[in-house]
A protein has these predicted regions:
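Structural detector for internal amphipathic alpha-helices that build alpha-solenoid repeat scaffolds
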Residues: 1-3, 12-13, 21-35, 45-46, ...
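Amphipathic alpha-helical scaffolding segments comprising HEAT/armadillo-like alpha-solenoid repeats
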Residues: 3-14, 36-47, 69-80, 101-113, ...
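Short inter-helical turns and helix N-cap capping residues of alpha-solenoid HEAT/ARM repeat scaffolds
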Residues: 18-19, 51-52, 84-85, 116-117
């Protein structure tokens, strides 16, 4: 939906409505809103502050459609290290895995050792391995 007023109402509902069902409906409707910075920031705010797991998962899903910049990466690292819900942590790790960079390795090390979920620990190791291969490839390109 391109109507600016409707977008603002959806943002407001997602971040402020007391009813989790309405927040879930708002985040679902945001799928039709074009990707731009306001939408990204509202989704990040929702995923970091939302109490309802379904809303957080849906917001993360929509965030995964954005190019992973520092703001999204930082939010996903916070989620990965602090969120109580395994599915939400998996979603954050998935976003990080799609845009691997060396600056996430320290957090991935912690997750690979400390996360209570075996799959998340193993996936963190896989992402670190991918990052080390990327670093080797980049070093080879520099040498050549």
């Amino acid at each position: 939906t391109n109507d600016e007023i409707i977008q603002q109402i959806l943002y407001y509902l997602l971040l402020n409505d007391a009813n989790p069902g309405k927040r879930l409906q708002a985040v679902s409707l945001l799928e039709t809103v074009p990707a731009h910075n306001n939408k990204k920031l509202v989704l990040i705010s929702s995923v970091l502050s939302e109490t309802n797991t379904g809303v957080r998962l849906r917001a993360l899903d929509l965030l995964s459609q954005f190019e992973t910049d520092k703001t999204i990466r930082d939010a996903c690292l916070k989620i990965l290290l602090e969120d109580q819900n395994e599915a939400v942590r998996m979603g954050a790790l998935s976003i990080l895995a799609n845009s691997p960079s060396a600056d996430i390795v320290p957090a991935l090390r912690v997750v690979s050792l400390m996360d209570q979920n075996e799959y998340i620990r193993e996936r963190a190791v896989e992402v670190m391995t991918d990052i080390s291969y990327l670093a080797e490839d980049q070093a080879l390109e520099v040498i050549q």
